[in-house]
């Protein structure tokens, strides 16, 4: 039970970190005065992609772990480390550079682009053999809720919190990457 709680906390922190990326993008998107129905669909779509993408990543990660053994663990840690650094660096870019229309096919591309990070994290987690269902449900839940929060708060806080939220998420992933790389 103690091990499950530890895994739940660690996975929740990762899910939160990935959700912060969606939150920061949603803050910027919230400036466009979306209707509540649109906000609902955007959150659901991003949540679904944060379930699908890490699932695909975990599937591939387990395959790589089986094929390459212990070296795959170092690859997983390095991926998290690089992903964290990338999130921190891009957090200082303008949000408008990443905006895609949140309607129709644009919403699908938007959700896909926001959830690409979760594929890489899923790949790393698949190498380590985490609980798949727990992981993808946490990723989907956190990203959906944080997207909704970002969209709702966007008008008020985008200028102040936007870059910092993604930087916080990147810092958490970077820390997990370091932990995985240097745990002997």
From Swiss-Prot:
Cellular compartments per GO CC: plasma membrane
Membrane topology: Multi-pass membrane protein
A Pfam family: Mntp
Cellular location(s): Cell membrane
Keywords: Cell membrane, Ion transport, Manganese, Membrane, Transmembrane, Transmembrane helix, Transport
InterPro entries referenced in this protein's UniProt entry, alphabetically: Mntp/YtaF, Put_MntP
Function recorded in the entry: Probably functions as a manganese efflux pump.
HAMAP family registered for this protein in UniProt: MntP_pump (MF_01521)
Family: Belongs to the MntP (TC 9.B.29) family.
One GO MF term: manganese ion transmembrane transporter activity
Organism: Geobacillus sp. (strain WCH70)
Entry-linked PANTHER family: MANGANESE EFFLUX PUMP MNTP-RELATED
Transmembrane segments: 8-28, 39-59, 68-88, 103-123, 132-152, 162-182
Name of the protein this chain belongs to: Putative manganese efflux pump MntP
